[in-house]
């Protein structure tokens, strides 16, 4: 051990020389510089998440001055010795950077979106938002360093003072970086000012002499021209004051025709309380003209089973608008002030995202304000469409709907909710609409953004689907449609069949003379009632075929012509409106029967004078099937929870952006894009008043031929069909099982087009009848009978 220790003590470790240490440090610096240059290269071009993250970390410190900072860092890494020889250059650059940081930070907090926000917190929120999403999108000002510099300066000198101080820093820094001396600069400005004063005095004297000479020459020329013009051209001749020559009339300049390029302020149109109504004109099929009068025996053909007993309505009086309550007009003067601020915010937001666009026009509607934006040439429309969430954030709005582009205009519409919603009452809408007494099915639906009343004619539609979530205004809209028709039509002109499985929405209309039968609330009865309407449609077509007409208008024209030439009077066929308040409940109970009836009515009922209004609060594909949508082309969408529901109703997004409370998108059959409307509000008291008035005019006269009859409890309990004794599909299911020698609920669903509940009950009935055996776990059931 002693020898080993002595050996260790005997060894001497060699210390590196200064040159070697300097070389090692140089190698380390070079490796570090290359590594940093490699990282900064990714940051400069924002390559991948690493590049974006490093770039955002630099932005966190110096904001949008990341590029100058990166280049300065590269120079420092690779030119350290050169920088040591130019201390003034380094100091000037630092002062210039401080001035730029202050300028950028002052500009950031001059924007409307950043006012009244904490300086440091607001800056960090912007950068961390981009950092978390791996993007570089928002303007970050001067970053954390700029915020620290801006806080005391803005506190002492305000935001404008920060701009001025930042400018002084910039000038001072640039001066220090330049090779000039202070005295040289002062002498330069002094000499330049002296030369400018001398030149200014010379130009002033020269202009004075030229004006004096021109004035004398002009006076002399005008006198000579006036003397000659009095004799040769009359007293009204035009004279050029510079040359003294007489001008022709064709040479005179009309200042009114001068079209200068003047920048105009955006036009702001306030919400009008009494705009002109704008109706969707619909052409009702005209009555066919015929010179041959129908024979009396043809009009009384008993084989057609049509009731021609005249029913008098001489004492029936149509309801007046006084039955509906008035509403106090809303003062929306506050909205105009907000609109001006929002226009500025919109344009600043577009600028921050690098989009050149100006707000050309703003229309204040009852519930939303529509800003019409003109994008510059070369700006893609989808760039504005993709900013919906960012615009909602900048405007502090609940939601923003973008219409890109506006149909018929080279503009993009941005719809922003108002701070206060102006209620549109049914009375206000009715008084402002251009009502046509001869169009019984024309209904004022709501007000557009510009305040105009939009109406639709159900005869043109000819069927309407109304869908929206609970509380969005769907039932109120249906009540408004019914009230509009009741205001125009007598009981002999229009009949209603109302189906209300919820039993609370349409029951108030019971016992009015316009009803064919009492309001149907039983879902099983509803499917049978719809089948009765289909039978009525077929009967009417047989009637049209017998008399050689194509539609109800032609038939009623023949009846009217017959009544003028015959003592026996007949009544024309009334229009029939079928209203279903909750389609989803019917589809759950008898989907196949209800869907078949709706499809047949949708395809053929228009010419027969039968129209449908289908309402549902569950706009899913199992309720609104593809066949139903194909045969009900006109849609009204209220607020829904998702874009999927909106596409189910309208075949496009948009309804998920609505506000509720009557805010709707109306897409009629003759328009490619939906129109946003604010629906009218009709209260329960208004409905009760008009119903009471109508009941006083006439009593209900129900038609027993449309009565669906009684439904047993067993029928009610069966979801998609009847019991084992009365189920019409039992024999079909039995034949199918015996033919295939297989039995399963899924097979019955596919082959018979029934729901799962009904298929399961059919399996139970087949088991009770001894056709199939009992269930054996996961094994298929045995078929006990053969074909």
Swiss-Prot record:
InterPro entries: AAA+_ATPase, FtsK/SpoIIIE/SftA, FtsK_alpha, FtsK_dom, Ftsk_gamma, P-loop_NTPase, WH-like_DNA-bd_sf, WH_DNA-bd_sf. Homohexamer. Forms a ring that surrounds DNA. Keywords: ATP-binding, Cell cycle, Cell division, Cell membrane, Chromosome partition, DNA-binding, Membrane, Nucleotide-binding, Transmembrane, Transmembrane helix. The chain crosses the membrane at residues 31-53, 57-79, 92-114, 134-156, 161-183. Disulfide bonds: none annotated. It comes from Streptococcus mutans serotype c (strain ATCC 700610 / UA159). Residues 1-16 have a biased composition (Basic residues). Signal peptide: none annotated. PROSITE patterns: FTSK. Its main location: membrane. It is a multi-pass membrane protein. Residues 1-21, 279-303, 702-729 are annotated as: Disordered. It is found in: Cell membrane. Belongs to the FtsK/SpoIIIE/SftA family. Gene3D superfamilies: 3.30.980.40, P-loop containing nucleotide triphosphate hydrolases, Winged helix-like DNA-binding domain superfamily/Winged helix DNA-binding domain. The keyword Manganese does not apply. Residues 450-647 form the FtsK domain. This is DNA translocase FtsK. GO terms for molecular function: ATP binding; ATP hydrolysis activity; DNA binding. ATP binds at residues 471-476. Residues 184-787 are cytoplasmic.
């Amino acid at each position: 051990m002693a020898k080993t220790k002595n050996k260790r003590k005997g060894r001497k470790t060699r210390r590196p020389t200064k040159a070697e240490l300097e070389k090692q440090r140089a190698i380390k610096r070079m490796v570090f510089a290359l590594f940093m240059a490699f990282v900064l290269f990714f940051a400069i071009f924002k390559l991948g998440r690493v590049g974006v993250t490093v770039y955002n970390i630099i932005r966190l410190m110096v904001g949008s001055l990341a590029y100058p900072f990166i280049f300065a860092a590269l120079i420092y890494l690779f030119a350290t010795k050169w920088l040591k020889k130019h201390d003034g250059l380094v100091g000037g650059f630092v002062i210039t950077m401080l001035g730029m940081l202050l300028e950028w930070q002052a500009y950031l907090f001059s924007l409307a979106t950043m006012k009244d926000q904490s300086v440091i917190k607001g800056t960090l929120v912007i950068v961390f938002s981009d950092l978390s999403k791996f993007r570089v999108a928002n303007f970050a000002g001067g970053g954390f360093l700029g915020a620290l510099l801006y806080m005391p300066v803005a506190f002492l000198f305000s935001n404008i003072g920060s701009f001025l101080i930042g400018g002084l820093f910039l000038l001072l820094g640039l001066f220090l970086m330049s090779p000039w001396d202070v005295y040289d600069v002062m002498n330069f400005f002094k000499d330049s000012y002296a030369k400018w004063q001398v030149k200014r005095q010379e130009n002033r004297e020269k202009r004075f002499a030229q004006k004096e000479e021109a004035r004398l020459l002009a006076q002399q020329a005008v006198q000579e021209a006036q003397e000659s013009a009095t004799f040769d051209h009359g007293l009204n001749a035009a004279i050029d004051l510079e040359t003294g020559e007489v001008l022709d009339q064709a040479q005179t300049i009309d200042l009114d025709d001068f079209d200068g390029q003047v920048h105009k302020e955006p036009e702001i149109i306030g919400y009008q309380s009494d705009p002109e109504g704008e109706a969707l004109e619909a052409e009702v099929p005209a009555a066919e003209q015929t010179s041959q009068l129908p024979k009396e025996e043809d009009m009384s053909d008993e084989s057609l089973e049509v009731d021609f007993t005249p029913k008098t309505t001489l004492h029936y009086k149509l309801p007046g608008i006084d039955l509906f309550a008035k509403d106090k007009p809303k003062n929306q003067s506050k909205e105009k002030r907000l609109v001006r601020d929002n226009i500025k915010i919109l344009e600043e937001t577009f600028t921050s995202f690098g989009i050149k666009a100006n707000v050309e026009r703003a229309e204040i509607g009852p519930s939303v304000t529509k800003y019409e934006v003109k994008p510059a040439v070369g700006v893609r429309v989808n760039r504005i469409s993709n900013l919906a969430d960012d615009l909602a954030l900048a405007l502090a709005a609940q939601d923003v709907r973008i219409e890109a582009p506006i149909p018929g205009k080279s503009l993009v519409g941005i719809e922003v909710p108002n701070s206060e919603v102006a209620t549109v009452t049914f009375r206000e809408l009715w008084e402002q609409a251009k009502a046509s007494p001869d169009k019984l099915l024309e209904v004022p639906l709501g007000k557009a953004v510009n305040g105009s009343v939009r109406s639709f004619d159900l005869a043109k539609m000819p069927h309407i689907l109304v869908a929206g979530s609970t509380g969005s205004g769907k039932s109120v809209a249906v009540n408004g449609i019914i009230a509009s028709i009741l205001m125009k039509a007598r009981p002999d002109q229009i009949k209603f069949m109302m189906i209300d499985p919820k039993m609370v929405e349409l029951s108030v209309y019971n016992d009015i003379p316009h009803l064919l039968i009492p309001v149907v609330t039983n879902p099983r009865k509803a499917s049978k009632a719809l089948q009765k309407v289909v039978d009525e449609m077929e009967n009417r077509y047989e009637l049209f075929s017998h008399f050689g007409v194509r539609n109800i208008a032609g038939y009623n024209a023949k009846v009217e012509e017959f009544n003028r030439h015959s003592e026996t009077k007949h009544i024309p066929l009334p229009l029939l409106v079928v209203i279903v308040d909750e389609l989803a409940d019917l589809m759950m109970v008898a989907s196949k029967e209800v869907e078949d009836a709706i499809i047949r009515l949708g395809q053929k009922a228009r010419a027969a004078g039968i129209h449908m209004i289908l309402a549902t609060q569950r706009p899913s594909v199992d309720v609104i099937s593809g066949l139903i949508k194909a045969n009900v082309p006109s849609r009204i969408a209220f607020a829904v929870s998702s874009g999927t529901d909106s596409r189910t109703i309208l075949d496009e997004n948009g309804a998920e952006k609505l506000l509720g409370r009557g805010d709707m998108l109306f897409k009629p059959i003759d328009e490619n894009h939906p129109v946003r409307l604010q629906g009218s509000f009709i209260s329960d008291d208004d409905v009760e008043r008009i119903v009471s008035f109508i009941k006083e005019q006439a009593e209900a006269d129900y038609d027993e031929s449309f009565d669906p009859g009684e439904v047993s409890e067993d029928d009610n309990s069966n979801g998609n069909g009847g019991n084992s004794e009365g189920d019409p599909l039992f024999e079909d299911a039995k034949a199918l099982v015996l033919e295939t020698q297989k039995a399963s609920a899924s097979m019955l669903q596919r082959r018979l087009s029934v729901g799962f509940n009904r298929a399961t009950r059919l399996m139970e009935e087949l088991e009770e009848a001894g056709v199939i055996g009992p269930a054996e776990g996961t094994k298929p059931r045995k078929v006990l009978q053969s074909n």
